[in-house]
Amino acid sequence: MDLTRALHDLFGFGDFRPGQREACEAAVAGRDVLVVMPTGSGKSLCYQLPGLLRDDLTVVVSPLVALMQDQVEALAARGLGDRVALVNAQQDGSTNADVMARARAGELRLLYVAPERFAAPGFLERMRKVRVGLFVVDEAHCVSQWGHDFRPDYFRLADAARALGAQALIASTATATARVALDVERRLGLSDPLRVATGFDRPNIAFAVARPGGHEKRPLIAEALRGPDALPAIVYAGTRAGAEELAGELSAALGEEALAYHAGLDRERRAVVQRRFLADDARVICATNAFGMGVDKANVRTVIHASVPASLEAYYQEAGRAGRDGGPARALLLAENRDKALHVHFIKREQIDEDLPGWLADRIAAAADGEGRYVLDARELVRGLGGDGDRLRSLLGHLTRAGVISPTPSAPDRVVGRLLGAFDRRAAALCRSSLDEGIKSRWRQYREIWAYVEQDSCRRAAILQHFGDHATPASRPGACCDSCDAGLVPAPPPPDPAAIENLDDAIISVARSARPSVGRTTCAEILHGGRSKKLLRNSYDGLPAYGGCSQMRRADILARVDELIDSGRLETTGGPYPVLRLPAHVAAA
C-alpha cells in the first residue's frame, strides 16, 4: 500500500511529519500503537489515515464533544464526510440511531464516541454488531492517575476494546511523560506496541518565564500583547474571576475587545466567544483551562499564562496552541511565589482521609437495588464528604479502580451506577494505594513545573527531556527561550507615576488619621479593604483611604510602605509593636 499517495489523495499533504509514517504503517498492519506527540504535530492523522484505508470500522474515543466535532468537520471539509460520524448525547436519538445503522451497514470508516458512552445501557451490545478493526483512545493520558487529566470514565475502555474484538488498540496523547506512557500501556493492555514519541520541539515558539511583582503582572501582559504580531492571543487565568477581570482590563488597555471564556458561562455564550475568536472577530481570549481542547486555530501568535499551571504537561499542552501554522509565536509564563504557595495548598487539600472511600461505598451499597443499581444525590454526598465536587469525583474514581462500582453518565447533581462488589479489605487496600499514588503524583508534578520555572538552563531542552523526545533542540535564531536569550522576557512597563503618588498619599493618609495608630501590616490591610475584627472594631473601615488600593496585593502595599520609611517620608516607633507616624516635615505639610 502506497501510504504517501494515500496521504496526498485523502489529505492533500505531500509527505509525512516525523513519526507519522511509522505509526500509520503499524496501525494498518493491525499492531498496537502508542503515539505521544504534542498539540499541532499531527497525531490525529496517525489513526485517521489508517482508519480510512482499512475495510472495517475504527472507533475513536475522545473526551470532548468539541474535539470530536472539530475532527469530523475537518474531515468533511476534505470530502470525507460520508465515511465519518459521531455519536453523542447532544444529538437527538434518531440521529444517533441513523449513525449506528450506517456503522452496521459498513458505510462508516471512523466513528467518534465519548468514553462515558460505553457505560450507557445497551451501547456495547449494539456495537458488537459492527466489525471493529482499530480502537483508538485519544487523550489517552486520561487513563493514568499520574497524568494531568485523570478520568475514571477511561477505566472501562480496555474491556470495551476486547469486547468488540478490535484487532489493534491505538493510544494517542499530546502530554505523556515516559512514566505516564508506561502506565497508559499497562492500563489499556497494549501488546508489544510501537512507541512513537516525537515532535515535542516546536522551533517556531519562543519560550519565556517572567517573575513580575503582583502590581506589574497585568500591565506586563498588556505590554506583551501590544507588540507587533502579538495577536491573536490566548491568556490563561487561574480562576473564572481572574479571566473576567483580565478581559476587562485588557479591553481598556489594548483598545480592542478581549473576551472571557470559562466553564461558568452558559453553553451558548461559550460558543459565541469561540466562534468570534476562530473568525478573528475577537483577537484576545482570557480563559481558564476550559478553553482550548477542540479549538483548532492555527494562527495564535501568543499564549500567556498569568499563573503557573499545576503540571508541566498541562502547561506545554496549552502553550502548544501557539503557532500551529508554523509561524513565529511566543509562550510566556508569569510566575509568582504565591503560585507556589497555592499549589501546596491545593495538593494538601486533595489529601483524602483513608476512611472516606469506605464511607462512600457504604452509602452506595445502602442505595443499591437488587441488581446493584444506585442513584444518589451528589450534593448530599459532597456535604457528607466535607469537600467539593472534585473530592467526590476523585473518590468515585478510586472505587471504580478498585472494582467496587461502575459509574454511569448522569446529570451533575446525581451519582448513578452499578455496585459490582463489596468494599472489603482488598478494595480498601487498593483505594489506599490509589490515594497515595495520586498524591505522590501531584507532588512530582509540582516539583517538575517549578524546576522548569526556576531553572537557568535551556527551557526547550528541558521540555524535550521531560517528554522523552531525544531530538536536538532547534529554533529560530534568537528565539529559543529566555535562558538562551534574556531579551525574550518582556520588560515590565514603567510604573505609573500617578498610581505611585496616589498610593503614597493613601499610606500617608492612614498614618495621619488612623486612631489608634497602626503598624505597616494593618495599614496595608486598611488600604486593601480588609474586614478583620480589628479593623471593624476600631472603625478603620470609615477612614477616607479605606479600600482605596483593593486592586493591589498587600505585599506590594507593604513594599511601598517600607520604601516611604527608607526615604524618610514615614517613621516607625520603637517597641515590640511599632506603629507608623509622620515625621515633622510631612505632618506639617
Residue ranges, per PLM feature:
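Helicase motor core with emphasis on the C-terminal RecA-like subdomain
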Residues: 1-10, 14-18, 22-44, 50-54, ...
